Amino acid sequence: MRKQKNKWWKAIKIIIGLTILSFFISILISLFTEDGIETLNGNVALIDITGIIIAEKNTGFLFEDVTSSEEINKLIRKANRNDRVKAMIFKINSPGGSAVASEEIANEIKKTNKTTVAWIREVGTSGAYWIASSADHIVANRMSITGSIGVIASYLGFSGFLEEYNVTYERLVSGNLKDIGSPFKDLTEEERALFESSLASIHAYFVEDIAKNRDLKKEDVEKIATGLFYIGTEAKQLGLVDELGSREEVINYVERQIGEEADIVRYKKEKGFFSALSQAMNEKSFYIGKGLGNSFITQAKFPNRIGIST
């Protein structure tokens, strides 16, 4: 009986071991294989913009999907220098992120002398839409989510928690507003007004850029710049996107503009092993509550500030 149990345990261990091994083998294969859309020396550059948009590379946690303006702009400049490349496709699946990083990418796209098209496949909201608006043409899936033209600032406040456990916050500052946004004290009316003023300014820049990029009246953009998101069909009616469709419509538009068959090559940022492993893990995993997790990650990395994002 005991021998039989040992045999079962050995069998279970072997099955678990083989499962883990096959999982990591599939990850390694995905790291070193190319998608069917990629070819060498193509005339159309494909650049992915996925996850949270940040300014500097390598600031995310191991399994956090992020796009850095620093890396994306390098890819745009690289494609722009390539005389063979006639057009750039920006494949977007992002909820937005840093206002600064979003504007940096949008400005870099506008500098290029190539045909540019933004492809919102699933999500292209807030800062990601800001980026999309800078392209010559926007194609979005009819059920995709886009728009959400607005700015948000938030922080976790622990003042009530400290008070409950009889912990005091000793405030020693030189400059009355030096600790503005500290999670260990409540915002004063003056501090709240200052933050709201900054948010209003960033929101105005956002609206102004969208209106200019999309050739819309500023007043019309202001009416829909409530932070609300729109599905693709609604966005088309509002003039936020040019065309409803998918990969086929994107390629058709590009070929009409460049006058030749599209030969697409994916421009990708260089990855170290852990970065590549992170992406592969993201592609093979489903994270429940990712938005909530990102909020707590941001606070964990920057506990003494209010983060402003689009």
Region roles according to the model:
Residues 1-118, 123-127, 137-140, 153-310:
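N-terminal organellar transit peptides
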Residues 143-151:
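Active-site loop architecture of trypsin-fold serine endopeptidases
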